[in-house]
Amino acid sequence: MIVTDKISNVRNIIKEQKLSGKKIGLVPTMGYLHEGHLSLVRIAKKHSDFVAVSIFVNPIQFGPNEDFDRYPRDLERDLKLLEKEGCDLVFAPSVEEMYPSELLTTVNVDKITEKLCGAFRPGHFKGVTTVVAKLFNIFTPDIAVFGQKDAQQVAVIKKMVEDLNFPVEIIKAPIVRESDGLAMSSRNVYLNPEERKAALILSKSLKEAEKLLLNGERNANTIIKKVNEVLNSEPLCKVQYVSCVHPDTLEDLTYIKDKALIAIACFIGTTRLIDNLLWGENI
């Protein structure tokens, strides 16, 4: 496994691999890897011949009062995990390597970034699309794998790829959960034992939504109401939003015809957690 913090090295390595006919897979991460991230690496391995992982806590996607400085980091541990998974290349740049001078060019996807998480985290998705566009230019991957847990992020990146003709296929990977149902997240480390228990209310509320859907309920408001009810039954849970949208366009649904995404964001104590249920689409 090659580890580098230099863009020029990545370019040379990828060029060499492409010349030998290899298909390049990319998994962009912010590090502090968990089983969810590792599942993305495994999916990338299935769809490509050479798997690269980027580890970069991207400052431009964090708001002024968010957790950039506090965000967990452990490169040594991450590298051990990636080596075990058979990853080929790890790119772990410094902020100076990614943004050597004042950043005057950004990539911004309109409309679909203004709702769900985007409504509460202004500028977040502009930071995400800008860094992902940079990574796509650095790696020129054939495929890139993103987790469904960040459903809005997947939709936004897919739209950017479509609109700007990036020659990369975006593969969506299913949410990986702890044995008790909590969606895996690097931020789960912030939760104290009481909050960790309370956080199960997110997946429980989505299970209730799934029950309704399986029983034939198609009215989005009925489902949203039920999810809110379950979430509000947990005293430590403060709901930020519950939405029922189309998974690709993120347009609000009133009636569920085929595909739907039930997306939620909550604060458990001071920790913001997201989760979702994808209905009518197999990934």
Swiss-Prot record:
This is Pantothenate synthetase. The keyword Iron does not apply. GO terms for molecular function: ATP binding; pantoate-beta-alanine ligase activity. It holds the Pfam family Pantoate_ligase. It is found in: Cytoplasm. Catalyzes the condensation of pantoate with beta-alanine in an ATP-dependent reaction via a pantoyl-adenylate intermediate. The active site is at H37. The reaction proceeds by a bi uni uni bi ping pong mechanism. One of its GO terms (cellular component) is cytosol. (R)-pantoate binds at Q61, Q153. Belongs to the pantothenate synthetase family. One of its GO terms (biological process) is pantothenate biosynthetic process. InterPro entries: Cyt_trans-like, Pantoate_ligase, Pantoate_ligase_C, Rossmann-like_a/b/a_fold. It comes from Thermoanaerobacter pseudethanolicus (strain ATCC 33223 / 39E). Its EC number is 6.3.2.1. Keywords: ATP-binding, Cytoplasm, Ligase, Nucleotide-binding, Pantothenate biosynthesis. Pathway: Cofactor biosynthesis; (R)-pantothenate biosynthesis; (R)-pantothenate from (R)-pantoate and beta-alanine: step 1/1. Beta-alanine binds at Q61. ATP binds at residues 30-37, 147-150, 176, 184-187. It is an enzyme of class 6 (ligase). CDD domains: PanC. It catalyses: (R)-pantoate + beta-alanine + ATP = (R)-pantothenate + AMP + diphosphate + H(+). Homodimer.
